[in-house]
UniProtKB/Swiss-Prot annotation:
Amino-acid positions noted as binding a divalent metal cation in the UniProt annotation, renumbered to this chain: D34, E35, D127
GO biological process: DNA replication, removal of RNA primer; mismatch repair
HAMAP family: RNase_HII_B
Entry protein name: Ribonuclease HII
Top-tier EC class: hydrolase
SUPFAM superfamilies membership: Ribonuclease H-like (SSF53098)
Annotated EC: 3.1.26.4
Organism: Chlamydia abortus (strain DSM 27085 / S26/3)
Amino acid sequence: MNTLAMDAEQLFLSKTIFEEEVFHEGFSLIAGIDEVGRGPLAGPVVAGACILPRGKVFAGVNDSKKLTPKERGKIRDILVNDSEVYYGLGVVSVERIDEINILEATKEAMAAAIANLPIHPDFLLVDGLHLPHKIPCKKIIKGDSKSASIAAASILAKEYRDDLMRELHQLYPDYGFDKHKGYGTAAHLAALKAFGPCDCHRKSFAPVRQVF
């Protein structure tokens, strides 16, 4: 094994400390939970839930924000094509976000991701939020950079949401959703000002509300 491969393996193993603690408490199916898309002005919020097999190394798994699109896509493909990896996704619409607020919508997306897992976890590691759930759970601040299963969930959610935003770009090409994925960049704000909001904008978010 070369030095780079060893470093990648060690980095991954350093992110399994929380999982190992929970394994030693007697749990066996530990799901990492993360969301993508709380901050954007447009598009849904998406959550991922991922159960990684104990003892198997997935080199390169890291906080999705620290990976290039190419790296994320490669790791996503590895995860979804591994029969020992179990994952679920939850999507909450713009309409629902505007109805109940982004925090509650995020919790709904996380609950949906857990429900969509093909097997039932017995413990949850959740990035940054206390998630009311019948399954025991632990909140980990900045969990996507500390927990392998949360990082894997963040990658799966990010890739799925980015694909959705590219689809929305085909329907609403004036806004550049394929580039900024709905976040409030200068180009996005300029397009909002020029064209007004479309159906996939979050009307409850101040920068969108201000252009009505």
